[in-house]
Amino acid sequence: MARLLRALRGLPWLEAPGRARGCAGSGRGDTGSLIKSKLSLSKADWQKKLTPEQFYVTREKGTEAPFSGMYLKNKETGMYHCVCCDSPLFSSEKKYCSGTGWPSFSEAHGTKGSDESHTGILRRLDTSLGCPRMEVVCKQCEAHLGHVFPDGPDPTGQRFCINSVALKFKPSKP
């Protein structure tokens, strides 16, 4: 618990909602773009756009069953995007097998050192289960993606534990 709290203290906190946000890519196969405004749909519109499972996870902060996600064992090279708004979120280059049952990444796409200001994600404190965790949401549409924990591999020490159903994979072009 102390390790988690120390890790939380050193993290960048939320940007104000509604501000223009950068979601720039980095180099090879750049899939980033400047996001000019936050995507906001009604509950009914999200339900029309998404499958019931996608809606439950991304809009109601649900969690898919462990070891059930379609991207858990995906080893293709490419980019993982938000299933709701198509923002680039995680590169396959930062994906690893954590053994937890969900796709895991060591950092978000666009991270520069410890600076996540050019990524497609935001972190939010989640105390819903009675112990503090760091929720990961999409900057563009605020979709719940999963959580990040301070028990990942070097050099970041982070484990972004992300629901497959919240992602859309786009393979790199040859």
Curated annotation (Swiss-Prot):
Stated name of the protein? Methionine-R-sulfoxide reductase B2, mitochondrial
Transit peptide from where to where? 1-61
Enumerate the subcellular locations listed in this protein's record, separating them with semicolons: Mitochondrion
Name the catalysed reactions: L-methionyl-[protein] + [thioredoxin]-disulfide + H2O = L-methionyl-(R)-S-oxide-[protein] + [thioredoxin]-dithiol; [thioredoxin]-disulfide + L-methionine + H2O = L-methionine (R)-S-oxide + [thioredoxin]-dithiol
Q: What does this protein do?
A: Methionine-sulfoxide reductase that specifically reduces methionine (R)-sulfoxide back to methionine. While in many cases, methionine oxidation is the result of random oxidation following oxidative stress, methionine oxidation is also a post-translational modification that takes place on specific residue. Upon oxidative stress, may play a role in the preservation of mitochondrial integrity by decreasing the intracellular reactive oxygen species build-up through its scavenging role, hence contributing to cell survival and protein maintenance.
Q: Which organism is it from?
A: Rattus norvegicus (Rat)
What does UniProt list as catalytic? 161 (nucleophile)
The GO molecular function terms of this record are: actin binding; L-methionine-(R)-S-oxide reductase activity; peptide-methionine (R)-S-oxide reductase activity; zinc ion binding
Can you tell me which family this protein belongs to?
A: Belongs to the MsrB Met sulfoxide reductase family.
Q: Name one GO biological process term.
A: protein repair
- Broad class of the protein's primary localization: mitochondrion
What keywords tag this UniProt record?
A: Metal-binding, Mitochondrion, Oxidoreductase, Transit peptide, Zinc
Q: Which parts of the sequence belong to the MsrB domain? A: 62-172
Report the InterPro entries cross-referenced here: Met_Sox_Rdtase_MsrB, Met_Sox_Rdtase_MsrB_dom, Mss4-like_sf
Q: Say which enzyme class the record assigns.
A: oxidoreductase
Tell me the residue numbers annotated for binding Zn(2+). Answer: 82, 85, 138, 141
Binding note for cofactor: Binds 1 zinc ion per subunit.
SUPFAM superfamilies in UniProt? Mss4-like (SSF51316)
Q: Which cofactor does the UniProt annotation name?
A: Zn(2+)
Species lineage, top-down? Eukaryota, Metazoa, Chordata, Craniata, Vertebrata
State any GO CC term: cytoplasm
**What's a Pfam family this protein contains?**
SelR
Q: What is its EC number?
A: 1.8.4.12, 1.8.4.14
NCBIfam families cross-referenced by the UniProt entry: peptide-methionine (R)-S-oxide reductase MsrB (TIGR00357)
Which segments of the protein form a coiled coil according to its record?
A: none
